[in-house]
Amino acid sequence: MYKDLEGKVVVITGSSTGLGKAMAIRFATEKAKVVVNYRSKEEEANSVLEEIKKVGGEAIAVKGDVTVESDVINLVQSSIKEFGKLDVMINNAGMENPVSSHEMSLSDWNKVIDTNLTGAFLGSREAIKYFVENDIKGTVINMSSVHEKIPWPLFVHYAASKGGMKLMTETLALEYAPKGIRVNNIGPGAINTPINAEKFADPEQRADVESMIPMGYIGEPEEIAAVAAWLASSEASYVTGITLFADGGMTQYPSFQAGRG
């Protein structure tokens, strides 16, 4: 538990399921106030709110698409209107879909780039704007991936979005460090989330993925949520401009870098 997170206001994009849901619940257990964001699945968002209530937390759900500028502006403003402030912005919303690079349409490319990279930029921009205007030493956390470092065949758009996120985060961290605003990435490896459920349900595919992880197991969303809580806390007060990989050592494993996966 991080005492200084109590009363902090945390906005998490794409938090009706997966990593976002785990982070929302973790911050609620830290007694932070949480803004749950969803694009279309209101029922799932409401389910997260119920789980937050069960742990004694306080939260609201705000609908919005991170690729739509006005939606992102509204998301941040909703946080301020409901809770009076914003302390932590977590740009978690993301997507992936496998397509051979030579067959990838511009629409395929743009959809992933707009969600993963432009969406994170818009969230970062709006949060930092509020921090600067109100002299708040806030924190931005962007959800990157091991694929900001590891090439990924069939996912050139995804890898490009995460590679771009790396330098975006480093640039924002450098630009706003003098104001005490911290900006960092989390780089998850293979995690048990709904997006991976079908793959990991297949014993052969699961074993293949586990063979590329030196620690030998697929991570849980709660392990990523723990990293986010630390980065948002004062325990990480001198940390900015990094990608903290939470991947069981996957980024160090040569067989993956040789093209497996």
From Swiss-Prot:
| Other noteworthy facts | Prefers NADP to NAD.
Quaternary structure note: Homotetramer.
Binding of NADP(+), residues:
11-35
Claim: Magnesium is one of the keywords in the record = no
Q: What is its EC number?
A: 1.1.1.47
Record's catalysed reaction(s): D-glucose + NAD(+) = D-glucono-1,5-lactone + NADH + H(+); D-glucose + NADP(+) = D-glucono-1,5-lactone + NADPH + H(+)
Family, similarity comment: Belongs to the short-chain dehydrogenases/reductases (SDR) family.
What CDD domains does the record tag this protein with? Answer: GlcDH_SDR_c
Keyword Oxidoreductase assigned to the entry: answer is yes
Q: Tell me which residues this entry annotates as catalytic.
A: Y158
The coiled-coil segments of this chain are none
What name has this protein been given in UniProt?
A: Glucose 1-dehydrogenase 1
The enzyme's first-digit EC class, named in words, is: oxidoreductase
Q: Which UniProt keywords apply?
A: Germination, NADP, Oxidoreductase, Sporulation
Q: Which domain of life is it from?
A: Bacteria
GO BP term, example: sporulation resulting in formation of a cellular spore
In this chain, substrate is annotated as bound at S145
* Name of one Pfam family that matches: adh_short_C2
Note the Gene3D superfamilies from the entry.
Answer: NAD(P)-binding Rossmann-like Domain
One of the entry's Gene Ontology molecular-function terms is:
glucose 1-dehydrogenase (NAD+) activity
